[in-house]
């Protein structure tokens, strides 16, 4: 996790009313974005943070007809008047960007918060074990783990409600989306 993400985390906590961090959600958010720009030698952070109009663009499938238009209208500029979910989406979207290319961290944030909005799976081949909108929630136990740690796997599957599937939610994965 880079420094930009470490700064964005207090913004997230502040947004969900964990107080005592010595700043506002906006100040932590903007500091995190600035650090991410600095770490990536990117220019234009002031214009980016002042941008109240740019929203996620539509995806055009160059091969098929699986185009997608994002419903998210979150912009880079902080909005003190936005509701909790809009502020959380803004924070996590920037954390997602700052974490690139750390895919597992981004996936964990998506599962934990539901943000940022991602393109849904077009062809779900899970035979109903994975919700198309929620997407993959966890990786099933491997064959080797099942062989070498049968009792641990059985205990884990029991804690998951008896399902060792990619759609089974982990204990911390409680959001409905």
Predicted feature residues:
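C-terminal functional modules
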Residues: 16, 36-177
